[in-house]
Each structure stands twice: as C-alpha cells, then as structure tokens.
Amino acid sequence: MKTLYSRRRFYHVETLFNGTLALAGRDQETTGFAWWAGNARLINLSGKLLGAHVAHAGLIVFWAGAMNLFEVAHFVPEKPMYEQGLILLPHLATLGWGVGPGGEVIDTFPYFVSGVLHLISSAVLGFGGIYHALLGPETLEESFPFFGYVWKDRNKMTTILGIHLILLGIGAFLLVFKALYFGGVYDTWAPGGGDVRKITNLTLSPSIIFGYLLKSPFGGEGWIVSVDDLEDIIGGHVWLGSICILGGIWHILTKPFAWARRALVWSGEAYLSYSLGALAVFGFIACCFVWFNNTAYPSEFYGPTGPEASQAQAFTFLVRDQRLGANVGSAQGPTGLGKYLMRSPTGEVIFGGETMRFWDLRAPWLEPLRGPNGLDLSRLKKDIQPWQERRSAEYMTHAPLGSLNSVGGVATEINAVNYVSPRSWLATSHFVLGFFFFVGHLWHAGRARAAAAGFEKGIDRDFEPVLSMTPLN
C-alpha cells in the first residue's frame, strides 16, 4: 500500500522505546510510536487496528454481561433497586423487562437472559479480536478492499461515517419498536404510580420535538432534559433514527464538498479527536439527564432526583402536620414566608421552606395534587392517596446527596443508612468521563492540526540529553 504522506511529517512526535520489547515488528523504528502508545502503532495496519477495536468491543460487552449477572445474583426483590447499588438492572427495568405496576420486579429471568446473551456475544467478539490482532491480515486493503481504507481518502472516510450513522439510526429504532410492538416500556407517569405500557400515540410534530432544542437550559425550561412524557421520548427517537439513517445514506452516496475538504483535517488522529469531542458532549448531556430527569430515568429504579427528594420531604411533613391539625395554607415559617406552602414570584402555589428553589419539579406522585395555579389547597386537604404518602416518605430518605447536611432542606444523617444513589454514581461518572474525553479531544486535535500544518510539537528528539545516557539495563 502506498503511503500518502512522509512518516516524519505525519508522526510528528516520536517516543522513546526499549527495542527489546518489539512486538511482531511493530516497534518504534517501523511505526514512530513506542509500545505504550498502544493503537497508535497500528495507524497504517488496518487489519490489526480492526482486531484492537473488535477486542475492545468484546471487553465492553463482557463487562456488561458479567456485571449484569453479578447484579442479578445479588438482587433482592423486596428492596428497591436504588438501595442495592444497581446500575444495569434499572436500565433493563426501564425498558419494561421484568417489572409490573409501581415498578415492582415480578420476574428476574429476562435480566438473566440479558446477561447470558452479552457474555456469549463477548466471546464471539473476543475471538474475532484475537484472530484479527494475531492471525488475520495486517492490512485489509489488498484482500478486502471494501473494508480497507487510507485515512486521507476523504470519500472513503465519509462512506464509513455514513455506515456508522445508519447503525446508530437502527439503534434508535430498536427502542421505538420495543416501545410500540414488543411489550412497551416502563412509564413512571402511568396512573396509580407507574406501569409498563405500549406507546401508541407518538409525538411526531417537529415543532414539539425540535422545540426542546430551542428551550433555555436554565430554570423551569431545562432544554431537552425537561422532557417528561414517553410519547415525546419515543417520537424523538423516530426523528433521530430517521435523520441518522438518511444522513448515513447521504454520506455514503456523496463526496465531501470543497469547503469541508478545506476546513477539516483528514487524518486518523483528527477523526479520533472529532469522536472524543462528540463523546464528551454525550457524557455531559447524559450527566444532566440522569441527574434531573425522572421520566427517562424513573425514580422507582434510580431513586429520586435531588429536587424530588427535597420536595418529597416538604410534602411528607405537610401530610404529617396537617393530620396533627396544622392549617397548612396559612402557617408561617421562621422567615415569615409560608411554612408549608407559599407563592412563587409568578404566582403559583409551591412548597415553602428551603425546597422553594425546586418549585419547578414535576413528579408523578405530586402532579395529581396540582391545579391551574400550582398546588391545589383543597386537593392537598382531601385527595392525598396512601401511595403518594408512601412514595414521598421513601424518596425523602433516599436523596442522591451522600451525607451532606441540609441540601435543599433535606435532613440527612450520616449514621442513618449506608446509601449512595445510582443517580449520584451515573451523573458523576458521566461528568468526569465526559471531561476526560473533552481533554482528550483537545489533545488529539492539537496534535492532528500540528501534523497537518507540518510542524512538530514537543522537544527535539534528535538532541535529547537522555539519548546520550547509559541504558537502564
């Protein structure tokens, strides 16, 4: 295969390497990268790079299957999922598998099947990864030109992009088909405290779906994270899946326009940086979604959101004190504002106390008590159902706050319960990983742009002092 660029110009940072550790000819002399630079050694070996990626997919799927079975083995049906440190079973339950009314787990067998299927898949991927890493052809261009590529071949790169987009679109439609035809998904808003249901009346109106993108990210607006009904979520997946598939077909059939050829850097490291940037955005959005959204991430499985736990505490004490004879409509708190209820600046009736900052919370156990002007006093006096009391008392004591005292007014006690909410884990991990991916995006973008501009970054390796020193061994 003809190399389209000089190695010196493209591999602009050379790394020190102990030659005795050369692996199958992929040493620093032949690649410009040391063993610890990992897959960078395989930039021009498409067959070996395929092996690395397939093996990596095998590791990911193996973790999913093994962790899935671990959670099934430790699962106690009598306790809520969020009390058991589970992060995978809540996702399966949200998809409607194994759960019934109120999010109660009625069958763990689907979870077991999911774990086993992932383990079997990981074995296939693992075998493929080892085969392509050790036995398969080093490069695919000669024997399998369809799967071969040169990083600078812009047309081939957009074709690969198109194939990826089509696969993502199919993934989005898998959720749509599950919700429409294959048993439905769990809806936390179903009457009486949540249930699995098929989604029949999809929201396909572009003004509603794309209206989410135009909303402010702040306060009661909340951008796309504010979505609170499954019709909109599944309808959004129809739109996303369609856009991905049509965009994929477009990128397969067309060549990049002149402005794109000029504006973008066309090298392996540049594509890596673009991908890391996209994943960073996904991570930050996922962080906000799992922290604030209790429709896509139902509180029955993931535990309450922070605002939800705070509002649940206000509601629980309102119920208690109302039973003890308090007039919750007029009682004053220590600041002179309403102790149980007050008005927001725009006039809605909201819970009083520190939880006032979370006045815009929407939760299935609370919404039935609202009227046209916020919380309805007559409903609070006459219509509170036992399931609402039970759920709010449960959520009050399971805030996703660790043991910080008085966050949003939630009374926490470090000795009370050994509990970390899955929302805390998932939100924190996705924020931290999203940040790392963003730094990786900046790093690889800088290297790729430097290489494209034809200059090297870093110290001059030819006259580096360490080269004149005795080897360690």
Curated annotation (Swiss-Prot):
Transmembrane segments: 69-93, 134-155, 178-200, 255-275, 291-312, 447-471
Modified residues (N-acetylthreonine): 15
Membrane topology qualifier: Multi-pass membrane protein
Keyword Oxidoreductase on entry: no
CC cofactor note: Binds multiple chlorophylls and provides some of the ligands for the Ca-4Mn-5O cluster of the oxygen-evolving complex. It may also provide a ligand for a Cl- that is required for oxygen evolution. PSII binds additional chlorophylls, carotenoids and specific lipids.
Modification Phosphothreonine, positions: 15
Broad class of where this protein is predominantly found: plastid
GO molecular function, one term: metal ion binding
GO cellular component: chloroplast thylakoid membrane; photosystem II
Free-text function comment from the UniProt entry: One of the components of the core complex of photosystem II (PSII). It binds chlorophyll and helps catalyze the primary light-induced photochemical processes of PSII. PSII is a light-driven water:plastoquinone oxidoreductase, using light energy to abstract electrons from H(2)O, generating O(2) and a proton gradient subsequently used for ATP formation.
Assembly description: PSII is composed of 1 copy each of membrane proteins PsbA, PsbB, PsbC, PsbD, PsbE, PsbF, PsbH, PsbI, PsbJ, PsbK, PsbL, PsbM, PsbT, PsbX, PsbY, PsbZ, Psb30/Ycf12, at least 3 peripheral proteins of the oxygen-evolving complex and a large number of cofactors. It forms dimeric complexes.
HAMAP family (UniProt xref): PSII_PsbC_CP43 (MF_01496)
Protein name: Photosystem II CP43 reaction center protein
Protein source organism: Solanum bulbocastanum (Wild potato)
